[in-house]
Amino acid sequence: MKILYAASEATPYAKSGGLADVAGSLPKALVKDGVDARVIMPLYGDLKYREDLEYVTNYSVPVGWRSQYCGLFKSVRNGVTYYFLDNEYYFKRRGLYGFYDDGERFAFFSRAVLETLFYIDFTPDIINCNDWQTALVPVYLNLYYRHLDKFNRIKTIFTIHNIAYQGKYGTEILEDTCGIGRRDQHIVEYDGCANFMKGAIETADKITTVSPTYAQEILDPWFSYGLDALLREKQYKLCGILNGIDMDANNPATDPYIPFNYSIDNFGEGKAACKKALQEKFGLHQDGSPVFAMVSRMVGMKGFDLVQSVADGLVDRGIELVILGSGENQYESFFSDLCARHPGRVGTYIGFEPALSQEIYAGADAFIMPSKSEPCGLAQMVACRYGTPPIIRETGGLRDSIHDSTMGEGNGFTFAGYSAHELYEACCHAQDAYNDKENWNNLVHHCMECDFSWDVSAKSYEGLYNEPANLW
């Protein structure tokens, strides 16, 4: 089985969000299982490990009515071959996204992915595309390449990591920039504009999302950002596969950033030492109170409006809070003020420090994730890996990965409705459970037993890749 994994970012080379973690981890897990999985991505101006890249060739790529240069480089890391597509006009910039011509940049990249197959000794069975930046790959494949022998058996999978970002532009971009003639523009047109993601949903052989629950949620108008009717029509080719985490990179037994390494065999001693260090760092009282933490972008979608409503009440109940993140000014201001109002009870760090986040995962007693919507979420899995039971709202991948322990089973605390009252009640349940040390230790042990490795996700993807031809 040969898989070409097309993504706009992948660790360790370039990252702006969770997509990079997936593109850097899933192919590695597939290769470990004997799949010939390769990654193709842009060669950005601030790409890491540029010194490892090997020049292969260059060629022209059609972009509307003109052609653009494309240089091809490659590198091999952890057994995975990475291809990098170079065009300095499009990609030699600071940052990955947010430019006025992003539509043109990634239309070029999508077309270049297919053109590259003429110049490498590799013909994939499946091209796995990811998010709107690669959404035109299946569109171009069906329109301009399917009749060629090299391409006529290639299947495509389109993975939706976050349906909120669809790649929407004015329809004038279609012919001039994307090279899609008027006869075929209906494939990409939606709601009066060009919608790259819509084109992929129409033309890809399979559609996946990053969790089973999210696959069901996006059929509902509340979650779909306008694409629910189309997705219900294409539901026969839609499924959800839960993402994983890098269990080696997130390992409390070897993590160089935490003050005391521990495993499932000595977590009591280890977490106590990490908690003490965390409380000292944030100036919190060491009086036996539980420490509940959040590591997240400070935006409403992550549930910060709920936390804002219950924070004072939680502190009054004897819970200490540690908050790490940045984002909307209203939340940054509130949690900075909260820290000032409750010295010794609340610690806030505005910004993001990877090392500090690891210290929080290890030192906190519980981890709060009350998201309004969460396609998959990785933080709750990392928290479990470090023996820190999550408190989550039942949505998306949170619902698929965390199960309520109130009745003696499960690996965290959950609530269903998006309300401050339900979040407060879940936190109270967690505090009560924390005070029962024997049951709490059993819960921590259960959390650390959870297998959220990419090996599990890779098996699910392999099952999809190997489905009989009649199911494609």
Q: Would you name each region that the model predicts?
A:
Residues M1-W472:
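Catalytic cores of nucleotide-sugar-dependent glycosyltransferases that transfer UDP/GDP/TDP-activated
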